[in-house]
């Protein structure tokens, strides 16, 4: 079967492997200590962010990462189906099937999902960035966003390769239709624009319809404004 990816899967795997070697996924994850009447509790930084309904997608997208993101989305919906969920995206892309699993979950749950690009959102990362709730998709000013067509490897007999090529074309068409629906672009325009890597800065992504706003700074609390 074809191994279809929507982005730098090899690069994403290298990033993840490097993180493991450096201990980033384990011992180097920052811990947050909170003190209450019951004593002290320690949270890893990502668990603490989850309490604020913030999900951080900071790696390549594979089945394991997708499973974690989907589980967090469903959990946060069960906690409060009315409050927004925030996904911060800094991803080089990855597996199409994994990314579509995240996408479908984002559309399925009741809360609005706000997406924010921090650093880079490439290929499936850009796809998920654009898939947030309309009006609630944003980027920091110096982030980079990239769209392109899916890639895949095929092997076996000629008939098998033909079947796999047809499947890749179906997936490509599906992704183009979804991206067009979220950006307001024509499907043919999306196909032409994603024929090769198309990199955008935050302003260009705003004009393309991938995001709705650019965050420069957080607004100051009302008390600070008054002083």
Curated annotation (Swiss-Prot):
GO terms for molecular function: ATP-dependent peptidase activity; ATPase binding; serine-type endopeptidase activity. Its EC number is 3.4.21.92. Pfam families: CLP_protease (PF00574). One of its GO terms (cellular component) is endopeptidase Clp complex. CDD domains: S14_ClpP_2. It is found in: Cytoplasm. InterPro entries: ClpP (IPR001907), ClpP/crotonase-like_dom_sf (IPR029045), ClpP/TepA (IPR023562), ClpP_His_AS (IPR033135), ClpP_Ser_AS (IPR018215). It comes from the Bacteria. The active site is at 123 (nucleophile), 148. Cleaves peptides in various proteins in a process that requires ATP hydrolysis. Has a chymotrypsin-like activity. Plays a major role in the degradation of misfolded proteins. HAMAP family: ClpP. Fourteen ClpP subunits assemble into 2 heptameric rings which stack back to back to give a disk-like structure with a central cavity, resembling the structure of eukaryotic proteasomes. Belongs to the peptidase S14 family. This is ATP-dependent Clp protease proteolytic subunit. The lineage of its organism: Bacteria, Pseudomonadati, Chlorobiota, Chlorobiia, Chlorobiales.
